[in-house]
């Protein structure tokens, strides 16, 4: 008879954005390091941790439903994440939740787990936890979170109230993590935060150290260092500060991917002012033109809100005109939705839901035509593709122009001998409004 005691099982549910995913990875890594068996289900788990999202109402609802399901299936639930910042709201609906913490409260979550499920005395997983930690993404790409919180006070957003003001991670720590990811076989690093271009602002861009060398705590210096890893580096959530212009030459020179995820939100000066967002249409179009002159290959992704309180038909038309002129490559659009605690809720003249929907459809139809034009220009061109999946029908991957989950795909029909993480040269054969079809070269 074996005396080996089975490791205690902890169920884990991760909801929300990539930034929340990174928080989940950190908690999971520590749980595994301490000897807990983390399982993706409620079966036999001694308790369940739910990492929630609370950014928009639909995310709040999804989080509350996940908590309810975990309570029904297991009974012992610890809640963390963005919705955890609203403890009263959770307890009103789910009073039986054991403990609640806000976002990035790693030590508190672990302390709560220890309280209800004793830390194992023997850890069978010590040698199984990789140096780069537990990852929830495929092995060939990973998110690298460089900061927490945000100093902006956009009226439609409640992130600062949940995650606090900007706190930049030490640059040496960030670069050391990036190196571990590369050594683990990661081919693409996706740099994320609430506000990537503000990296280092809170510490006045002080000089840090990595490998004994001084490195400035700034987005540009970070990009220059990450480039030395010789893997794909993709920038997300880049607030349109003037110094973003300094990253474009690095893209031209192949140091980071020529891809910029830069949320612009609207084109009307009055609506932008109500949102507390920067920029004017003329200046933004000038910058886009300049970026394309410096780096003709650059892919621009952005997000916009239609139906913001007070938005007139004329102001919406300004947004459509901007979309037509800017010819952005990838665009996300959201209908304004009141978020509990957002300042924009107090603004007059809410836009009726049917008008929001009609504007959303017009916006997406126009952007679809822009996307069709842009992708059609890629037919016949050669490019490098990172393979994500392979099945009996062939391989699916992404070019530098496509971030995982949110952008388009490149299909390689019949190519069943490839494997995820392969970087291959292809020629583009066909395109539709979102995706490409290609053939291997050679």
Swiss-Prot record:
<comment type="similarity">
    <text>Belongs to the methylthiotransferase family. RimO subfamily.</text>
</comment>
<feature type="domain" description="MTTase N-terminal">
    <location>
        <begin position="8"/>
        <end position="118"/>
    </location>
</feature>
<feature type="binding site">
    <location>
        <position position="150"/>
    </location>
    <ligand>
        <name>[4Fe-4S] cluster 2</name>
    </ligand>
</feature>
<keyword id="KW-0949">S-adenosyl-L-methionine</keyword>
<keyword id="KW-0411">Iron-sulfur</keyword>
<dbReference type="InterPro" id="IPR007197">
    <property type="entry name" value="rSAM"/>
</dbReference>
<dbReference type="InterPro" id="IPR005839">
    <property type="entry name" value="Methylthiotransferase"/>
</dbReference>
<keyword id="KW-0408">Iron</keyword>
<dbReference type="InterPro" id="IPR006638">
    <property type="entry name" value="Elp3/MiaA/NifB-like_rSAM"/>
</dbReference>
<dbReference type="Pfam" id="PF00919">
    <property type="entry name" value="UPF0004"/>
</dbReference>
<keyword id="KW-0808">Transferase</keyword>
<comment type="function">
    <text>Catalyzes the methylthiolation of an aspartic acid residue of ribosomal protein uS12.</text>
</comment>
<dbReference type="InterPro" id="IPR012340">
    <property type="entry name" value="NA-bd_OB-fold"/>
</dbReference>
<feature type="binding site">
    <location>
        <position position="157"/>
    </location>
    <ligand>
        <name>[4Fe-4S] cluster 2</name>
    </ligand>
</feature>
<dbReference type="GO" id="GO:0035599">
    <property type="term" value="F:aspartic acid methylthiotransferase activity"/>
</dbReference>
<dbReference type="InterPro" id="IPR005840">
    <property type="entry name" value="Ribosomal_uS12_MeSTrfase_RimO"/>
</dbReference>
<keyword id="KW-0963">Cytoplasm</keyword>
<dbReference type="Pfam" id="PF04055">
    <property type="entry name" value="Radical_SAM"/>
</dbReference>
<protein>
    <recommendedName>
        <fullName>Ribosomal protein uS12 methylthiotransferase RimO</fullName>
        <ecNumber>2.8.4.4</ecNumber>
    </recommendedName>
</protein>
<dbReference type="InterPro" id="IPR002792">
    <property type="entry name" value="TRAM_dom"/>
</dbReference>
<feature type="binding site">
    <location>
        <position position="82"/>
    </location>
    <ligand>
        <name>[4Fe-4S] cluster 1</name>
    </ligand>
</feature>
<feature type="binding site">
    <location>
        <position position="53"/>
    </location>
    <ligand>
        <name>[4Fe-4S] cluster 1</name>
    </ligand>
</feature>
<keyword id="KW-0479">Metal-binding</keyword>
<feature type="binding site">
    <location>
        <position position="17"/>
    </location>
    <ligand>
        <name>[4Fe-4S] cluster 1</name>
    </ligand>
</feature>
<dbReference type="GO" id="GO:0046872">
    <property type="term" value="F:metal ion binding"/>
</dbReference>
<feature type="binding site">
    <location>
        <position position="154"/>
    </location>
    <ligand>
        <name>[4Fe-4S] cluster 2</name>
    </ligand>
</feature>
<dbReference type="Pfam" id="PF18693">
    <property type="entry name" value="TRAM_2"/>
</dbReference>
<dbReference type="InterPro" id="IPR023404">
    <property type="entry name" value="rSAM_horseshoe"/>
</dbReference>
<feature type="domain" description="TRAM">
    <location>
        <begin position="376"/>
        <end position="442"/>
    </location>
</feature>
<dbReference type="InterPro" id="IPR020612">
    <property type="entry name" value="Methylthiotransferase_CS"/>
</dbReference>
<dbReference type="InterPro" id="IPR013848">
    <property type="entry name" value="Methylthiotransferase_N"/>
</dbReference>
<dbReference type="InterPro" id="IPR038135">
    <property type="entry name" value="Methylthiotransferase_N_sf"/>
</dbReference>
<dbReference type="GO" id="GO:0006400">
    <property type="term" value="P:tRNA modification"/>
</dbReference>
<dbReference type="GO" id="GO:0103039">
    <property type="term" value="F:protein methylthiotransferase activity"/>
</dbReference>
<keyword id="KW-0004">4Fe-4S</keyword>
<feature type="domain" description="Radical SAM core">
    <location>
        <begin position="136"/>
        <end position="373"/>
    </location>
</feature>
<dbReference type="GO" id="GO:0005829">
    <property type="term" value="C:cytosol"/>
</dbReference>
<dbReference type="GO" id="GO:0051539">
    <property type="term" value="F:4 iron, 4 sulfur cluster binding"/>
</dbReference>
């Amino acid at each position: 008879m074996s005396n080996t005691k089975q490791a205690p099982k902890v169920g884990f549910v991760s909801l929300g954005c990539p930034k929340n995913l990174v928080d989940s990875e950190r908690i999971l890594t520590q749980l595994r390091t301490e000897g807990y068996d983390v399982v993706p289900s409620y079966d036999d788990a001694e308790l369940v941790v739910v990492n929630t999202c609370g950014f928009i109402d639909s995310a709040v609802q999804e989080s509350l439903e996940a908590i309810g399901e975990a309570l029904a299936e297991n009974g012992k639930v610890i809640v963390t994440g963005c919705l955890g910042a609203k403890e009263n709201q959770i307890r009103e609906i789910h009073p039986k939740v054991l403990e609640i913490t806000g976002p990035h409260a790693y030590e508190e979550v672990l302390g709560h787990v220890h309280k209800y499920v004793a830390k194992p005395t023997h850890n069978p997983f010590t040698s199984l936890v990789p140096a780069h930690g537990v990852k929830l993404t495929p092995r060939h790409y990973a998110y690298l979170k460089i900061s927490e919180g945000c100093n902006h006070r956009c009226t439609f957003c409640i992130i600062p109230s949940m995650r606090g003001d900007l706190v930049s991670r030490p640059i040496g720590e960030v670069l050391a993590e990036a190196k571990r990811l590369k050594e683990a076989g990661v081919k693409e690093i996706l740099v994320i935060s609430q506000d990537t271009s503000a990296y280092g602002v809170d510490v006045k861009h002080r000089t840090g150290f990595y490998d004994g060398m001084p490195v400035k705590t700034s987005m540009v210096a970070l990009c220059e260092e990450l480039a030395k890893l010789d893997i794909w580096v993709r920038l997300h959530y880049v607030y349109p500060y003037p110094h973003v212009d300094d990253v474009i030459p690095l893209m031209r020179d192949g140091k980071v991917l020529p891809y910029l995820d830069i949320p612009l939100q609207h084109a009307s000066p009055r609506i932008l002012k109500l949102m507390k967002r920067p920029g004017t249409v003329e200046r933004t179009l000038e910058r886009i033109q300049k970026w394309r002159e410096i780096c003709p290959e650059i892919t621009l992704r952005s997000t916009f809100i239609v139906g913001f309180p007070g938005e007139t038909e004329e102001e919406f038309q300004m947004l459509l005109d901007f979309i037509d002129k800017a010819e952005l490559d990838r665009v996300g659009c959201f209908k304004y939705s009141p978020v509990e605690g957002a300042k924009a809720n107090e603004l007059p003249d809410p836009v009726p839901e049917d008008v929001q929907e009609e504007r959303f459809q017009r916006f997406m139809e126009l952007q679809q035509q822009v996307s069709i034009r842009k992708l059609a220009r890629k037919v016949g061109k050669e490019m490098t593709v990172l393979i994500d999946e392979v099945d009996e029908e062939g391989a699916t991957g992404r070019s530098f122009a496509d971030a995982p989950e949110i952008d388009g795909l490149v299909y390689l029909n019949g190519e069943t001998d490839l494997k995820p993480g392969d970087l291959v040269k292809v020629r583009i054969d066909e395109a539709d409004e979102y995706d490409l079809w290609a053939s291997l070269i050679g």
